[in-house]
Amino acid sequence: APTAPADTVVSDISEARACTPNVSLTSASQRVRSLVAQMTIDEKLGQLNQAAGGRSKSLNSKLTPEELGKVRNGEIGSYLHVAGAEPLGELQKVAIEESRLGIPLLFAMDVVHGYRTIFPVPLAMAASWDPDVWREATVISADEASSAGLHWTFAPMVDIARDPRWGRIVESAGA
């Protein structure tokens, strides 16, 4: 396997696509530096763009050719609320295999009280006074979300509820 100093920029696109944790050429920071050096301004801006997917988005019924084109062109860096391993995998395949640099998409979802297995809202679980109940629910939610291809979730939410008028108090453990 090729090796290079940490400040080396990979100039060949095919070499950049081969930058995986199993290839000694790259550490994560080296891969990032290499990709950023090759990116156009539009591709860099695309990494800041998070598209709304909708919980049941599938490529066959919901994703338009225009949206796929944006993924191919590097105009989308992440998706919010695309549920299920199949649509995530299909979107990821387009990003990795059909975009210029093969940069993977990030996928995120609100998993405040479950992903596939739905649990009581956090405020209700807190009312049980049993931290193990909450811990078990969050472990199950994390396992389900990560196995479906999600990279990050917006949970658990650990803000202290100081004002009962706050509309998202139900997502916290309360005061």
What feature does the model see in each segment?
Residues 1-5:
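N-terminal Sec signal peptide cleavage junction
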Residues 9-175:
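N-terminal beta-rich core of secreted/periplasmic extracellular enzymes
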